[in-house]
Regions:
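Nucleotidyltransferase catalytic core that binds NTPs
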Residues: 1-138
Length: 138
């Protein structure tokens, strides 16, 4: 039996949209077992505003797209990569987490940067909602 390729990706997963789904499907297509880290609220707040959806809802929304869903309690996936030791770390071209990338290279593993889906983002959706709310209060 051949060794299975283990992949690791991570998302905030707030307002799961087409870009998230495509990213997760692409990650899954390139490995046999996909671990997906869902960032805890604490992790998100290291670099972004507080998510609209609570952690448990974001966790559940990601479940259909990964074999194993785990909590990522830091913005960097480094701790989870050290614990899981995936063969592949999936990143987005919109950002690359240097510490985790350096670690993966140091243990002879791969980093694959998948294209950012620029047509839609959680931030764009939130801005649209805010705009509509502002219009309705005028």
């Amino acid at each position: 039996m051949k060794d299975k390729i283990i992949g690791y990706c991570y998302v905030v997963g707030d307002i799961l949209h087409k870009g998230h789904r495509e990213h997760l499907r692409n990650c899954k297509a390139m490995c046999d077992i996909l671990f997906c880290g869902v960032l805890s609220e604490k992790a998100v707040l290291e670099k972004k505003p507080k998510p609209i959806l609570p952690y448990h809802e974001r966790f559940d929304a990601v479940r259909p797209y990964a074999d194993v869903v785990v909590c990522q309690d830091e913005y960097s996936p480094l701790s989870n990569c050290k614990a899981i030791k995936p063969d592949v770390l999936f990143e987005s071209t919109s950002h690359k987490e240097q510490l985790a990338n350096n670690y993966m290279k140091s243990i002879g593993k791969r980093i694959i940067a998948l294209p950012y889906y620029g047509e839609q983002s959680s931030s764009m959706i939130k801005e649209k909602i805010r705009g509509k709310q502002n219009e309705s209060t005028k």
